[in-house]
Amino acid sequence: MYIIFRCDCGRALYSREGAKTRKCVCGRTVNVKDRRIFGRADDFEEASELVRKLQEEKYGSCHFTNPSKRE
């Protein structure tokens, strides 16, 4: 099980449930237990999709796509 949360910089992240900390790309070490949880996912693929959607809601589309999803 994975949980989805945000860093103080605003970036959406995911981590395994039970993990104590997670390192954000901004350099901060985030204490997972103190974060507001935005969602839960059963596997890492579902978690990464939820993170991608949260990022697009906040910052807009980045135009990077998975090659298997191109039409």
From Swiss-Prot:
Domain of life, per lineage: Archaea
InterPro entries assigned: DUF1922, MTH1184
Matches recorded under Pfam families: DUF1922
Protein name per its UniProtKB record: Protein MTH_1184
Species of provenance: Methanothermobacter thermautotrophicus (strain ATCC 29096 / DSM 1053 / JCM 10044 / NBRC 100330 / Delta H)
